[in-house]
Amino acid sequence: MFEPLAVKLRPNNIDEVIGQKHLLGENKILRNITENGKIFSMILYGKPGIGKTTIALAIVKQLGLKCRTLNAVINNKKDFDIAIEEAKMYKGLVIIMDEIHRLNKDKQDLLLPYLESGLIVLIGMTTSNPYHKINPAIRSRCQILSLIHISEPTRL
């Protein structure tokens, strides 16, 4: 099966990620997650193509955690129900959710009790300001991390 080049070259751990040193550098928040093995719910906020999904996948892969990737727009309630059942079966699951700013109220209400209990760890990604677009109940249970533009000297 055809695999896009971006997928083939995607980093397997945070050491392979270029840029975002304010989050991935020594003693920084995302570096500490991988070193301590303790993950928490977060929202990664930044422009398209800046590495939000790549960072989320690298963290999960590096920690060897079970995860499910969902899209707030494309996936329906049944997909969310399946993810919750997986979380119960595995006694925990990381949900990587793209376009979290477009998550409707029903899906938010469905996820909230599992976020609160710790059964689900949510890594949401958004290009929109999370303070304006994401439900305060979800937002209050997540650390909001802003990704910045990669400067020229950092690029390969």
Predicted feature residues:
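Pre-Walker A (pre-P-loop) alpha-helix and adjacent loop at the N terminus of AAA/AAA+ ATPase modules
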Residues: 2-41
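Short glycine-rich substrate-engagement loop in P-loop NTPases that contacts/grips substrate
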Residues: 26, 67-92
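Walker A/P-loop
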Residues: 34-69, 86, 112
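Loop/turn-to-beta-strand initiation segments
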Residues: 40, 91-94, 118-123
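Walker B catalytic acidic pair
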Residues: 98-99
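Conserved catalytic/switch belt of AAA+ P-loop NTPases
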Residues: 106-129, 136-137
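A short helix-turn-beta junction within AAA+ P-loop NTPase domains corresponding to the substrate/partner-engaging
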Residues: 137-148
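Residue-level detector of conserved catalytic or cofactor/ligand-binding positions
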Residues: 146-156
